[in-house]
Amino acid sequence: MGVAVNRMVGYFTSPLSVALTLVVAGLVFLALGRRRGGTWLVLVGTLWLWIFSTGFAYAVLGGRLERMYPPQRVEDLPEADAVVVLGGGVGADTNSLVYAELLRGADRVLHAARIVKAGKAPVVIASGEGEREASLPLLKEFGVPEEAILVENESRNTEENARRVANLLADRPGCRRVLLVTSSWHMRRALLMFRRHAADVEVVPAAIDYEGIVAAESLALPRSLAPSADMLMKNSFMLKEYVGYWGYRILR
């Protein structure tokens, strides 16, 4: 799917967008004198927003995605010809900062470096827009030699990651197996796209970044039912993953 389609999917699967649409529609109905329909729309919109603002929803949605790719020691990973790490965890370096900012999912870069330093792969391919300024300095700081780092610097979404990295791998005929590093909740969709675009290469998941499992293990009522902006943001990511995965499977 293109970038514009991705943004539309993100908007229409956002719990906040859905809730606001329902509430505004309900208020319009009430203004037109349709009290029953308007009241129901406002109630459903409010309930929808509350559900997806809770840690309970995140433990269910995120935990299910993450448990598909359980935590694994680097020592248990197979040897591969390259590590592919998807970007998004490191803020691009700017003139106003001394060091790049670590964002949600920054442990992707650390895990890729960990894999290389364990001798499981000789090369890291960092894929994503701005990765030359973001992940490259951090990989070097984590001890990966610059000559062992390849950067694909133009991808704006996961499908572009898969397509552009597949082109890089096609130029490396000896590359038969890669370890794919991304957040555990993102792995299912990323694997689907990489295995489709790089069909001649064995793509092995090397997941990291487990938050849903931790949330599920620390689940406690009634605290997990209290709404928060952080949970709303995380659940928005999870819903986008589910819709993106099934949309890609159906449409492609």
Q: Can you say where each PLM-predicted feature lies in the sequence?
A:
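Membrane-interface helix-boundary motifs at transmembrane edges
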Residues: 30-38
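Extended, histidine- and acidic-residue-enriched regions that form the cofactor-binding/catalytic faces
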Residues: 16-18, 55, 249-252
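Hydrophobic membrane-insertion alpha-helices, especially the h-region
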Residues: 40-55
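Membrane-embedded alpha-helical segments of integral membrane proteins
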Residues: 1-30
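Hydrophobic alpha-helical segments of integral membrane proteins
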Residues: 1-9, 57, 61-65, 235, ...
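C-terminal capping/extension of enzyme domains
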Residues: 219-252
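A structural signal for short, hydrophobic/glycine-enriched beta-strand patches
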Residues: 51-232
